[in-house]
């Protein structure tokens, strides 16, 4: 169960992996983009994972229609606003929404910097007067290669004051972290944090590389850390967080079933691991499902779940005063 006396956070949540099917339909019609279906029910199998995909890259293809329909910057702004509406509807107190400006821009010839500006504007507009707080994490989509990621980074750094971190996501096998060392030097020079997708498609060495060469303070997924006890000790001792995404790891076939998921072992080891959604619309789940269904299936007790909930606040990219304010707010409701 979710402890409502603690803040509820989702700090690994892809904005461009959470585009409503209805919105895809409406934007497709608006921009005369041919979609694989003309109603929500028929569209769902094309934009949502129904059965586990064979691998990460097959899973990621389900996100494509959500960005294919982004025909102008107002469309980008719209999905940013709807992401905040969805987070508030779920009772989330704080979200870190991550997005890849190049991925969102490329299908309809938008400029990544314009996408960044539109997303920031949408988030600022939607959070005014809302019960959910939000920060943004920019993504470098490694799948497009080193040069495109530099363009993407340039677009993000133009608005660095509106971001809390930069992430590296996409094809971990085809484009390993070693290719992006120079990019993350620029990230740290801009005084932004780094959270890296690692140990999802590759093994523990990918996580070591993310920490040692890319300066990661958090690891997205990090499932393969379980293979290396020294790494688990290091994550615990250096307080490097793991953003676990239970259902996602099943749907990408990173883990075969939840009973085998290492989140419970991470928590038992003292690692600051937490529970997140990843791509809610694509997975057909929300944060409540991860806490009430997926976490118990992964062997977590109520105490484990509350620990994971508290860990999310501890590793969130928030100031001490902001964390304290969230704790105070939650404790009095």
Curated annotation (Swiss-Prot):
Catalytic activity: adenosine + H2O + H(+) = inosine + NH4(+); 2'-deoxyadenosine + H2O + H(+) = 2'-deoxyinosine + NH4(+)
E.C. designation(s): 3.5.4.4
Alphabetized UniProt keyword annotations: Hydrolase, Metal-binding, Nucleotide metabolism, Zinc
Residues annotated as catalytic: 200
GO cellular component, one term: cytosol
Keyword Zinc set for record: yes
GO biological process: adenosine catabolic process; hypoxanthine salvage; inosine biosynthetic process; nucleotide metabolic process; purine ribonucleoside monophosphate biosynthetic process
UniProt site (Important for catalytic activity): 221
Positions bound to Zn(2+): 12, 14, 197, 278
SUPFAM superfamilies on file: Metallo-dependent hydrolases
Protein's UniProt keywords contain Zinc: yes
Family annotation (InterPro entries): A_deaminase, A_deaminase_dom, Ado/ade_deaminase, Metal_Hydrolase
S-S bonds: none
Cofactor(s) listed: Zn(2+)
Cofactor stoichiometry and binding remark: Binds 1 zinc ion per subunit.
GO molecular function, one term: 2'-deoxyadenosine deaminase activity
Binding residues for substrate: 14, 16, 170, 279
Family: Belongs to the metallo-dependent hydrolases superfamily. Adenosine and AMP deaminases family. Adenosine deaminase subfamily.
Functional summary from the UniProt entry: Catalyzes the hydrolytic deamination of adenosine and 2-deoxyadenosine.
HAMAP family linked to this entry: A_deaminase
Record NCBIfam families: aden_deam (TIGR01430), PRK09358.1-1 (NF006846)
The name this protein goes by in its record: Adenosine deaminase
Gene symbol of the encoding locus: add
């Amino acid at each position: 169960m979710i402890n409502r006396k603690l803040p509820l956070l989702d700090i690994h949540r892809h904005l461009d992996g959470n585009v409503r099917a209805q919105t895809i339909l409406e934007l497709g019609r608006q921009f005369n983009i041919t979609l694989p279906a003309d109603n929500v029910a028929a569209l769902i199998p094309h934009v949502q994972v129904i059965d586990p995909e064979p691998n990460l890259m097959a899973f990621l293809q389900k996100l494509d229609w959500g960005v294919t329909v982004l025909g102008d910057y107002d469309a980008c702004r719209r999905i940013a606003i709807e992401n905040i509406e969805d987070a508030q509807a779920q009772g989330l107190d704080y979200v870190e929404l991550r997005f890849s400006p190049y991925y969102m821009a490329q299908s309809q010839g938008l400029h990544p910097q314009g996408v960044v500006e539109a997303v920031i504007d949408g988030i600022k507009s939607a959070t005014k007067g809302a019960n959910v707080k939000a920060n943004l994490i920019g993504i470098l989509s490694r799948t497009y290669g080193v040069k495109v990621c530099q363009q993407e980074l340039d677009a993000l750094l133009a608005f660095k004051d509106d971001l809390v971190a930069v992430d590296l996501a996409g094809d971990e096998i085809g484009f390993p972290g070693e290719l992006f060392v120079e990019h993350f030097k620029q990230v740290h020079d801009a005084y932004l944090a780094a959270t890296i997708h690692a140990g999802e498609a590759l093994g523990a060495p990918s996580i070591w590389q993310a920490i040692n060469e890319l300066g990661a303070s958090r690891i997205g997924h990090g499932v393969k850390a379980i293979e290396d006890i020294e790494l688990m000790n290091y994550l615990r001792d250096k307080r490097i967080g793991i953003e676990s995404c239970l259902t996602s790891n099943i749907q990408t076939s990173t883990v075969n079933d939840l009973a085998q998921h290492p989140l419970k072992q991470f928590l038992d080891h003292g690692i600051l691991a937490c529970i997140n959604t990843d791509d809610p619309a694509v997975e057909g789940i929300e944060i409540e499902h991860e806490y009430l269904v997926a976490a118990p299936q992964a062997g977590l007790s109520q105490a484990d779940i509350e620990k994971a909930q508290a860990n999310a606040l501890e590793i969130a990219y928030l100031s001490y005063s902001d964390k304290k304010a969230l704790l105070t707010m939650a404790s009095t409701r």
